[in-house]
From Swiss-Prot:
It holds the Pfam family HOK_GEF. Keywords: Cell inner membrane, Cell membrane, Membrane, Toxin-antitoxin system, Transmembrane, Transmembrane helix. The chain crosses the membrane at residues 5-25. Toxic component of a type I toxin-antitoxin (TA) system. When overexpressed kills cells within minutes; causes collapse of the transmembrane potential and arrest of respiration. Its toxic effect is probably neutralized by an antisense antitoxin Sok RNA. It comes from Escherichia coli O157:H7. It is found in: Cell inner membrane. Its main location: membrane. This is Putative protein HokF.
């Protein structure tokens, strides 16, 4: 039964990540979540191909 829930969790994750990417689109290089006194920031540093 645990395997069934793990499979569902992986499927949900695999659907959520592309959906989030489509929603965020151009501003994907920086992601910030602010809640009360906590701020979570993820920044992607990359160099585009020339």
């Amino acid at each position: 039964m645990l395997t069934k829930y793990a499979l569902v969790a992986v499927i949900v994750l695999c659907l959520t990540v592309p959906g989030f990417t489509l929603l965020v689109g151009d501003s994907l290089c920086e992601f910030t979540v602010k809640e009360r006194n906590i701020e979570f920031r993820a920044v992607l540093a990359y160099e585009p191909k020339k």
